[in-house]
Amino acid sequence: MDYFTLFGLPIRYDVDGGLLASRFQALQRQFHPDRYAASPERERMLAVQQAATINNAYQALKHPLKRAEYMLSLHGFDVNNEQHTMKDTAFLMEQLELREELDAISQRSDADVALSAFAGRLQAMIVKRCSHMRDEFDNETWTDAADTVRKLRFLDKLQQQVEELEEQLLDR
């Protein structure tokens, strides 16, 4: 059973977060291992396995990038374990420039202002790519969606680096 079906949701990129959370809580209550403490060992083990599946499914569907990766896996794309080489040199050059810019921000006297502006631009890039990806999923252009997911992974990693730098600047 796929994760969407587990939560009674349609297989779509856009997910109602509130509905996902409420169904997650209901399934957690239903399959919580403590409810099976007095049951035979086989039932207890099945409950533990089901609880783990529910948790994994929720984590995959809750995060937009993980959800996209999971949806692609349903269509035969394993973007987590592939050795795919990014062929979009313009995108790769842009990533190098963004990383250099982020590295330079920490040395600036107005680092907090510069980082805020950088984070805003990065967020706009992520929103734009997510919009493209949404269209690609809706149109079932899986190869294009996989390419967009690969690009979003670069941006997601850059977003994590922005958050790390924000923490460093707060500690100064």
Swiss-Prot record:
Tagged with keyword Magnesium: no
Gene Ontology cellular component list: iron-sulfur cluster transfer complex
One example of a Gene Ontology biological process annotation: protein folding
Domain annotation J: ranges: 2-74
Subunit structure: Interacts with HscA and stimulates its ATPase activity. Interacts with IscU.
HAMAP family: HscB
Protein name, as recorded: Co-chaperone protein HscB
Protein source organism: Pectobacterium carotovorum subsp. carotovorum (strain PC1)
Gene encoding the protein: hscB
